[in-house]
C-alpha cells in the first residue's frame, strides 16, 4: 500500500521565505535552509519551494537557495516559479531539486512539459494547476499568474492534457479554499483522480488534522500540501501523521 505524503510548502522571495513563519526554535525565520531542516526533523515527506518573485534577477538567487537547501536536507525537493525553459529546469535539477513544477508557462506552451519529460524523465516534471470553481459554467477554471488571471480552460481537461504532454505528477491548488483553513475541496480531487492516473498533490484549505483525514479517506490523492498551518505552528507534521495513522491511513 502506498503511503500518503505530507508536504510543507515554502514561498521564497529573493532567497527568503515569506508568508510569515513562527517556528519558535528558529532564530532566523526567513532562512529557507533553517526552515527546511526544521521540517525534515518533523518528518515531512517532501518539500515544495515556490519562487514567488520568479523574475530573471531572482533566478540566480533561487538556484543558490536550492543548492543550499539540497545540501542540508535529504527529503525530495520540488521547485517551481518562473520556469520558462528546459535550461531553467536543468539549472534547478542540477542545483539539487528532485522535481520541477511548471504552472503558467505550461498552460501557455504544453510542449515544455514534453521537452522536460523527454530530457529528465516524467518523474521529474510536475504540472501545477491553480483553479477556481466557475459556478455559471459548472466547472473548475484554470487560473495563471499566481491565481490572478483566469483562463478559458477547464481544469480537469487541462489536467488530462498536462499528463498526456509529459507531467508525471500534478500539484493542484483550489484558489477558493487557499488560505481559508476550512478544508480541502474534496469534489475537485475526486474529479481529478477519476480523470488521471498520475499522483496528485492536493493544496489549499488545510486547517486541521481532520481535514487531512478527510482528504485521504474521501479521495485517492497521493499527498496533502499546506503552508500557513505548518509555518505558524498551528499544526505539526507529526500531529497530522498521528491522526492519519489513527484513521488507518498509511503514512511513513
UniProtKB/Swiss-Prot annotation:
IGPS catalyzes the conversion of PRFAR and glutamine to IGP, AICAR and glutamate. The HisF subunit catalyzes the cyclization activity that produces IGP and AICAR from PRFAR using the ammonia provided by the HisH subunit. GO terms for biological process: L-histidine biosynthetic process. Heterodimer of HisH and HisF. It is found in: Cytoplasm. It comes from Lacticaseibacillus paracasei (strain ATCC 334 / BCRC 17002 / CCUG 31169 / CIP 107868 / KCTC 3260 / NRRL B-441). Its EC number is 4.3.2.10. Its main location: cytoplasm. This is Imidazole glycerol phosphate synthase subunit HisF. It catalyses: 5-[(5-phospho-1-deoxy-D-ribulos-1-ylimino)methylamino]-1-(5-phospho-beta-D-ribosyl)imidazole-4-carboxamide + L-glutamine = D-erythro-1-(imidazol-4-yl)glycerol 3-phosphate + 5-amino-1-(5-phospho-beta-D-ribosyl)imidazole-4-carboxamide + L-glutamate + H(+).
